[in-house]
Amino acid sequence: VLRAMAGIVLSLVLMACFLQGAHLFYAGDYVLPISLANAAQLDLLLTAPRVAALTAAFTFLVTIEWLVIGRGAIINARFRWGLALVLLISGIGLQAFVIKNSLRVSPAEIDLTSPGRQVLGSPLAELIDVTKKVFREHKKNQALTEIELNTAARFGISIDQNAQFPLIKPNIYTSPPPLEVDGESGSFRKYNVIVLLSEGLSSRVMQPYSQDYPGLTPNVDDFSRTAMTVDNYFNHTFSTYRGLHGQTCSFYVYFGGGSVIDSASYSCIPDILRRHGYVSSFFYSQYNERTQIDEIMQRAGFDSIYDGKHLGDDYLSSEAANLEIGLSDQQFMKAFIGHLKSAETTQKHGDNDPFYFSLYNIETHALRHPAEDAKRYQGVNSYVLDTIHNYDDTFGQFWRYFQSSPYYDNTIVIFTADHSRFYDRDFRVLVEHQSDYRPIFVDRMPLLIYHPSRELAKNFDANYASSID
């Protein structure tokens, strides 16, 4: 019995250390609540080398456990106890190294100029703690702890967790809007709208916001010459499910964001525009069976939803998908342009209802390497920059087509992101030299708006507003 109990304890400790160590290596932090909340999307990150590494590590752990507590006659008790002692000392040493070198930003002390810090604790204890937090978020009125509520209060945010909508805002503006709207007495021309909710982009590496990596996003930079560039604009939530749903509906999504609360009564942008005669469609590159985006965006009110398979079948002929989960960014934009071309005739004659289109790509996702058809960045050897440069190339294809299309004079184009870039190791090495960068999942995002009237300001300071505003 004691041997079995020892085996269970050792298994838990080893697996916790392995899991926390892997997460620490890639993300610079132990497993986070958002990681567990999005565990169903793990396949986005499982490349062949990572699967091989995970398999090798798991095999090693099982072998070590058998050597320490196994009953095999070929291993004597003295050797097993000696190995156990070595593992114990190594574990203590590793933990000391982690505590000394792996400091994280404390959520209670977030400050863009002087953040507080706190050390990492025991791998097993912290894994248990984060698991408790995730289960607590499933319970009504327990999504936030007292510490988190007090932190919100420090920033002037009052949260009543007993309310149906704890963060409801009773008004949009208390003073005149900063940007005027066409028309008088609330009337306006019904422009089409295309919104690119790009996967995980932070503006700090992109032109026109930054010149740290010249030529990284030349097409977005070119777009900015015609569009209004918004600065100091931050994400209000994360990750993808929360970002897509939260921005479309202007709210904070419950828990991981993958579950849809049908009983809640709220209207989103497609619902509001429908009352003014708009039709809405959402386009994304993944296959619907690999994600919950279909269900989420249906609840957000979109009339039609096109996943990677639908777009591939309709606009890419027999071309095979370049990603195991769907279309590459190159294929996705090619298919979307094909969709726009198919409706050009009605646009020219004005025989159609105004539309609201929203797009979501996948290749710029944290820890994902570019597909084989990607266009690589020639400045710095980094797969992170490759994915951003490749996505910019696809946007350039869209923008060049758009400027010569019937949509140019009747369609608003908004380029932004679902949330900022996650602070994974490979991104941090690119930006940690910037004095205002902090390894937290909140950062400045790109926001550029093209309006056919060409009357928007060249630049606009959002003054630290977020995507919920």
Which residues does each PLM region occupy?
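Intrinsic-disorder/low-complexity regions
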Residues: I64, I128, K140, L149, ...
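Solvent-exposed soluble domains appended to multi-pass membrane proteins
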Residues: N162-D469
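Low-complexity, intrinsically disordered short peptide segments enriched in small/polar/basic residues
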Residues: L83-I89, G156, F165, D409
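Short, well-ordered helical secondary-structure segments
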Residues: A6, D29, P33, N38-A40, ...
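Transmembrane and membrane-interface helices of multi-pass
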Residues: V1-E137
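Membrane-interface segments at or immediately adjacent to transmembrane helices
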Residues: L94-K190
